[in-house]
Amino acid sequence: MRRPWTPSAGRFTFEGRAPARAAVQEAQMISRLAAGLTRHPAMAGAGLSLLSLPIHLVLPEAVSIPFAAVILGLVAGIYAGFALQDGRANILAIEGLAAVAFLALALAGLAWSPWFIPAAYALHGVWDLLHHRRISTAMPSWYPPMCAVYDWVFAAGLSALWILR
């Protein structure tokens, strides 16, 4: 079991290690995690999705639906951020239109039927694969497959949770 940083003999130690050594070991651990993400982005997406689904078990339906819609809006905005970083007008237009479309689906989920929200997540997974294959927005190569799997697992899991309520 890891212990937090504690004062010991006038200096800080972490599990008996000096601060510099502890910092190096922590950086190496983070580096290994990041390397795993780039080698296995689909597994990372599935894992992140499975980590984010349990909150919908404890949230009441009146909160779960808007929360999922807000996260969908944030997810859609990530690609707009990549487009802004990219700087090309055509990419910004494509990403901007897509973000507006996903925001519209999130709002439709709030206004008419919550089932628009998991459907939008599933469609966003398709959009992710289009990025991976067709759209040349500047972004990390691991991001589209990670996000696609996240979206599909989350859409399926959210649908299952809402059906079982």
Predicted features and spans:
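N-terminal membrane topogenic signal
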Residues: 29-45
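Cytoplasmic-side transmembrane-helix entry/capping segments in multi-pass membrane proteins
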Residues: 41-42, 90-100, 142-148
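Membrane-embedded alpha-helical segments in integral membrane proteins
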Residues: 45-60, 74, 103, 158-159
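Structural signature of hydrophobic alpha-helical transmembrane segments
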Residues: 59-73, 112-122
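Membrane-helix boundary connector in multi-pass membrane proteins
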Residues: 111-122, 126-142
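Juxtamembrane boundary at the C-terminal end of a transmembrane helix
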Residues: 157-165
